[in-house]
């Protein structure tokens, strides 16, 4: 039975970053490339990519993982090193790498799924929602050395996830058309079972029992199929945030990762001080997430226990002052990903848009 353990939670403040990317051809169009990039035993992933490169559901979606990072100061260098290695590895096989929450022109009916048994099982069981799941995300792991603390922190993080989604939203196009959303990826992904905003868990045992029950009843094959926006990762001993869209610009990834790390560390200290935590209705959290995926940078978010809302700008100002991190301010001052994609598409053409998503371009 593939479930985790409370014993996994034995490190505090460590980091791991998982980024999902698209394999594309010279023009930026999606193409199947995992066979060569992952399974070419004459030219396998090496160096920082060794054992840290894997495919996702579709043959044009690939994932990287950083090494375990002991300190947040190592994030920028590590993320860049992994990306540089991936771009070089792809180029050696005749491919390029692109990133966004969704590839604007990828039509899921025309793309092939991988043949890995785990994914084939999901396709058979979940059917349509998984068959169309061409999404790519950014997943951030922060180590927590106490399982109950990790569960409490995951509970508290939930209200902060919609603003994070709004900041990262860059997937307005899906299947070749404009969805009208800032993050269509978030909407498409939450059509899968066991996704979206999780409920509040009383303690680690409550989460663990859910994980165990879901596996034992055959609702999921393994713990990894609890795809919530945030979860205590019972294998890695981390709090894992899975909300953001994937990013082409590494500085955006780094800003998001640094903020999540600061947020987790702040909540860890508050848990140690005996704070009781914030109770907020799931419906409010879902409404805030909808605002983020629909409006992106223009979203407003309902404040727990209040009739008031906060704008994204107000949220960023508050968090920057509270936690002493300035990456969000820099990120907010830049053009949002969804807006940029629409501008490039409208003012130029699809080729310019696709080029802007490639990791080896300065566009």
From Swiss-Prot:
Give yes or no: UniProt keyword Ligase.
Answer: yes
UniProt-listed PANTHER family:
GLUTAMATE--CYSTEINE LIGASE 2-RELATED (PTHR36510:SF1)
Provide the E.C. number(s) assigned to this enzyme: 6.3.2.2
Q: Which GO terms describe its molecular function?
A: ATP binding; glutamate-cysteine ligase activity
Q: Per its UniProt record, what SUPFAM superfamilies does this chain match?
A: Glutamine synthetase/guanido kinase (SSF55931)
Quote any Pfam family the record assigns.
GCS2
User: What is this enzyme's class at the first EC digit?
Assistant: ligase
What Gene3D superfamilies does this protein map onto?
3.30.590.20
Instruction: Give GO terms for biological process.
Output: modified amino acid biosynthetic process
Q: Which sequence ranges form a coiled-coil region, renumbered to this chain?
A: none
> Species name for this entry?
Haloquadratum walsbyi (strain DSM 16790 / HBSQ001)
Which named protein is this? Glutamate--cysteine ligase
Instruction: Give me the gene this protein comes from.
Output: gshA
């Amino acid at each position: 039975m593939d479930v985790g353990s409370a014993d996994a939670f034995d490190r505090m403040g460590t980091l791991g970053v998982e980024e999902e990317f698209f394999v594309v051809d010279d023009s930026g169009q999606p193409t199947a490339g995992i066979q060569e990039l992952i399974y070419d035993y004459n030219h396998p992933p090496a160096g920082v990519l060794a054992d840290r490169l894997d495919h996702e559901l579709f043959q044009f979606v690939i994932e990287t993982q950083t090494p375990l990072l002991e300190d947040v100061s190592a994030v920028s260098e590590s993320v860049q090193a992994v990306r540089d290695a991936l771009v070089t590895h792809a180029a050696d096989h005749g491919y390029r790498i692109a990133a966004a929450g969704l590839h604007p022109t990828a039509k899921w009916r025309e793309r092939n799924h991988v043949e890995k048994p785990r994914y084939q099982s999901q396709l058979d069981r979940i059917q349509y929602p998984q068959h169309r799941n061409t999404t790519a995300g950014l997943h951030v792991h922060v180590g927590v050395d106490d399982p109950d603390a990790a569960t409490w922190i995951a509970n508290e993080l939930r209200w902060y996830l919609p603003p994070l989604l709004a900041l990262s939203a860059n997937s307005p196009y899906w299947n070749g058309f404009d969805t009208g959303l800032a993050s269509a990826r978030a909407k498409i992904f939450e059509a899968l079972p066991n996704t979206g905003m999780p409920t509040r868990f009383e303690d680690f045992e409550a989460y663990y029992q859910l994980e165990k029950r879901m596996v034992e009843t055959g609702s999921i094959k393994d713990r990894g199929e609890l795809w919530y926006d945030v979860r205590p990762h019972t294998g890695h001993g981390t709090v894992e945030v899975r909300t953001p869209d994937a990013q082409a610009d590494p500085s955006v990834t780094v800003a998001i990762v640094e903020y999540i790390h600061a947020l987790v560390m702040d909540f860890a200290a508050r848990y140690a001080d005996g704070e009781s935590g914030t109770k907020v209705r799931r419906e409010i959290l879902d409404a805030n997430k909808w605002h983020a995926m629909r409006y992106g940078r223009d979203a407003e978010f309902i404040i727990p226990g209040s009739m008031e809302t906060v704008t994204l700008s107000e949220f960023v100002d508050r968090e920057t002052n509270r936690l002493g991190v300035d990456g969000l301010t820099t990120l907010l001052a830049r053009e949002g990903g969804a807006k940029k994609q629409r501008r490039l598409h409208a003012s130029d053409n699809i080729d310019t848009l696709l080029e802007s998503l490639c990791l080896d371009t300065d566009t």
